[in-house]
Amino acid sequence: MKNSRTWAWRAPVELFLLCAALGCLSLPGSRGERPHSFGSNAVNKSFAKSRQMRSVDVTLMPIDCELSSWSSWTTCDPCQKKRYRYAYLLQPSQFHGEPCNFSDKEVEDCVTNRPCGSQVRCEGFVCAQTGRCVNRRLLCNGDNDCGDQSDEANCRRIYKKCQHEMDQYWGIGSLASGINLFTNSFEGPVLDHRYYAGGCSPHYILNTRFRKPYNVESYTPQTQGKYEFILKEYESYSDFERNVTEKMASKSGFSFGFKIPGIFELGISSQSDRGKHYIRRTKRFSHTKSVFLHARSDLEVAHYKLKPRSLMLHYEFLQRVKRLPLEYSYGEYRDLFRDFGTHYITEAVLGGIYEYTLVMNKEAMERGDYTLNNVHACAKNDFKIGGAIEEVYVSLGVSVGKCRGILNEIKDRNKRDTMVEDLVVLVRGGASEHITTLAYQELPTADLMQEWGDAVQYNPAIIKVKVEPLYELVTATDFAYSSTVRQNMKQALEEFQKEVSSCHCAPCQGNGVPVLKGSRCDCICPVGSQGLACEVSYRKNTPIDGKWNCWSNWSSCSGRRKTRQRQCNNPPPQNGGSPCSGPASETLDCS
């Protein structure tokens, strides 16, 4: 199948370096927010007035999508009575190249005399459609314990234990979903958080009565606290990128069998509107004489913890895993990760994050006799007192007039020759487009923060998580041959990580960011650049930062160690651009 025009998979792209500074993709609290529209037209208009767009001397050659040859057919699976084969993505399409338009796996019926031993003995009631095994005491109790209502069928009488309506915990649906950590996107449900095992004790939070799911060990409300911003100054884009974005990047590189110790902050998919907006607005200041003031306020409203064992899996995930072939076939296991993610959440912090970045023109600041410390002081105290108490500003070593000048420039930043070049805002939690709209108009006020905090309380985002690989949900309680399936999932996860990486994309021009969407690569261009490869720009001889190529395969195990390498040549640094950050080689223990 080499050189074919095929492939239509839904796997998201490995998250690029900006992920975690951006918020939670497709989370409760992010729906309805469209920050990509705020201010972008004005920014582009100002460029059009002051600069003439020109094309870089680059000839774009369409790159066609290319798949590997088919793998060999597996033997006939005795339980599914099917056999399988698959193909890998070798080269994504790019620059209007020919796409891959058909499936990257094939399944066909077959006949075998081998017996199927895939059934796990059930001592209770076997649900008719979902195949779930539930305790007989849960029959006819008014709850859909099976997920298909078969436990409530043919009942002479319903003995309903819960007499009062109770709400579901905030964000509980996303907490039950699998998460693709290569994209920070939530996928299909892997846990059933609508299963209660007959439990009906109410849990009160803010006078609201909640029903605790069987799988949940604890869901603890947190005090809102004060709306305070932590402000930090960065004298260059490279400092800003390293300290704000790269430190909160996705977990795209794994050791320890894809296990990640501790709790970490979630990011956002580069495919989301907010992710693209953030890249376009901040990347254009790379290799400019701009300085950055980054401010952030965190709000925690609840802590969530999953039970450590005996979990009730969602019936859709249960059935999909049961249909996996025991003989390894990457295509079937790859589809499981596409549909249900790579990991599941064991602990989480729910709440919101309000952050903004002021981008200042260093030369204009010097002409106006401003320092970044002045901007810091004015921004911080404008939030606290609304710019009303002159003595506070004087005590900070900056005049009232100077502070008012800065704050007015923030509102008028789309005009030419201003000291404030941009205000980039990211609001997570609250699901309020109104708040996001206001956030782009001026620095946050106490009233705006109170409005946002009230919205976060009832519609929080998942901002931090602790996770386990999806294969940890495959236990002998639910699956025969669980050890075989787990080992297959581990192997497939390593292959999946390599296949969905944007390192397969050709470089974008002008520090554009390549993003792999299924089997197609796109370039996200900084504001001021456009074209399929960001090749049309107002800037000449732009410094190009280096980007890593794909990792090599792991070496064979020698001396209980194995290694792999990668090269900084996709593209290499050019015109004084920055080198790649991170290691060029990795070493792991092996046996």
Curated annotation (Swiss-Prot):
Domain MACPF: 158-504
Residues in the signal sequence: 1-32
Region: Disordered, residue numbers: 568-591
Domain TSP type-1 residues, every copy: 64-117, 545-591
Modified positions (Phosphothreonine) in chain numbering: 418
Any one of the GO CC terms: extracellular exosome
Positions annotated as glycosylated: 70, 73, 101, 243, 551, 554
Keyword Kinase: no
Membrane topology per record: Multi-pass membrane protein
Compartments in which it is found: Secreted; Target cell membrane
Transmembrane segments: 252-259, 262-269, 379-386, 392-399
InterPro entries the UniProt entry points to: C8A_B_C6_EGF-like, LDL_receptor-like_sf, LDLR_class-A_CS, LDrepeatLR_classA_rpt, MAC_perforin, MACPF, MACPF_CS, TSP1_rpt
GO biological process per UniProt: complement activation; complement activation, alternative pathway; complement activation, classical pathway; immune response; killing of cells of another organism; positive regulation of immune response
Ligand binding (Ca(2+)): 138, 141, 143, 145, 151-152
Cysteine disulfide partners in this protein: 65-100, 76-110, 79-116, 122-133, 127-146, 140-155, 162-200, 378-403, 503-550, 505-521, 508-523, 525-534, 557-590
GO MF: protein-containing complex binding
Propeptide cleavage-removed residue intervals: 33-54
Activity modulation comment: Membrane attack complex (MAC) assembly is inhibited by CD59, thereby protecting self-cells from damage during complement activation. CD59 acts by binding to the beta-haipins of C8 (C8A and C8B), forming an intermolecular beta-sheet that prevents incorporation of the multiple copies of C9 required for complete formation of the osmolytic pore. MAC assembly is also inhibited by clusterin (CLU) chaperones that inhibit polymerization of C9.
Annotated ranges, domain EGF-like: 505-535
Cross-referenced Pfam families: EGF_C8A_B_C6, Ldl_recept_a, MACPF, TSP_1
Domain called LDL-receptor class A: residue spans: 120-157
Alphabetically ordered keywords of this record: Complement alternate pathway, Complement pathway, Cytolysis, Disulfide bond, EGF-like domain, Glycoprotein, Immunity, Innate immunity, Membrane, Membrane attack complex, Phosphoprotein, Repeat, Secreted, Signal, Target cell membrane, Target membrane, Transmembrane, Transmembrane beta strand
Assembly, per entry: Heterotrimer of 3 chains: alpha (C8A), beta (C8B) and gamma (C8G); the alpha and gamma chains are disulfide bonded. Component of the membrane attack complex (MAC), composed of complement C5b, C6, C7, C8A, C8B, C8G and multiple copies of the pore-forming subunit C9.
PANTHER family, sorted: COMPLEMENT COMPONENT C6 (PTHR45742), COMPLEMENT COMPONENT C8 BETA CHAIN (PTHR45742:SF5)
Name of this chain's protein: Complement component C8 beta chain
Source organism: Homo sapiens
